[in-house]
């Protein structure tokens, strides 16, 4: 996947509220694009593979998880190896309405409740 085709067909699907900023999620041919504001008029973009939300839904349906849970129990290093890939995959879940970020925490870790609906 090259930068020239990264944004082909991208359409906005939703947003997720993080601790410090909002994350904007787009569905594109290359996967889900998560855009996070970095400075005025500047965004960073992370690509999340298309099958990540389905894997999370199937594995963790109806449970509360943290970013670390994805690494320990996700069993998909191709999807969940790096910390920010795991975090952004959870933000994609929130934007798609398949999860919600809880106000409570597990220690310092953010908790996400994965929807029990298919």
Predicted feature descriptions by range:
Residues 1-81:
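Short amphipathic alpha-helical interface segments
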Residues 2, 54, 87-88, 101:
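Generic structural signal for short, flexible, solvent-exposed coil/loop and linker residues
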Residues 78-96:
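Short amphipathic alpha-helical interaction segments
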């Amino acid at each position: 996947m090259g930068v020239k085709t990264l944004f082909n067909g991208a359409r906005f699907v939703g947003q997720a509220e993080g601790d410090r900023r909002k994350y904007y999620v787009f569905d594109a041919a290359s996967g889900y694009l998560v855009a996070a504001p970095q400075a005025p008029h500047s965004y960073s973009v992370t690509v999340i593979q298309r099958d990540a939300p389905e894997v999370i839904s199937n594995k963790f349906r109806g449970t509360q998880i943290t970013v670390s849970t994805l690494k320990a129990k996700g069993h998909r290093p191709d999807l969940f190896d790096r910390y920010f890939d795991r975090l952004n995959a959870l933000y994609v879940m929130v934007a798609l309405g398949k999860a919600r970020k809880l106000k409570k925490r597990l220690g310092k870790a953010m908790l996400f409740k994965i929807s029990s609906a298919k």
